[in-house]
Amino acid sequence: MVPPVQVSPLIKFGRYSALIIGMAYGAKRYSYLKPRAEEERRIAAEEKKRLDELKRIERELAEAQDDSILK
């Protein structure tokens, strides 16, 4: 087995600093994007509900035309 290599404290400091900065950036970015994603999901749900209602009405109208007395 190969013995561990001595790494400069400056390099260790740089690595851990980059790790911590990356984690902080990710947390900040996540908190920025989360409300936007929730808003997009809410809008998509409202749009889906509206389209489902239109399809239901269209289907009822088609059934009403098929069941008309004047056949």
From Swiss-Prot:
Mammary gland, liver, kidney, heart, spleen, brain and lung. Signal peptide: none annotated. Keywords: Acetylation, ATP synthesis, CF(0), Hydrogen ion transport, Ion transport, Membrane, Mitochondrion, Mitochondrion inner membrane, Phosphoprotein, Transport. Its main location: mitochondrion. GO terms for cellular component: mitochondrial inner membrane; mitochondrion; proton-transporting ATP synthase complex. The modification Phosphoserine is found at S68. GO terms for molecular function: protein-containing complex binding; proton-transporting ATP synthase activity, rotational mechanism. Belongs to the ATPase e subunit family. This is ATP synthase F(0) complex subunit e, mitochondrial. The gene is Atp5me.
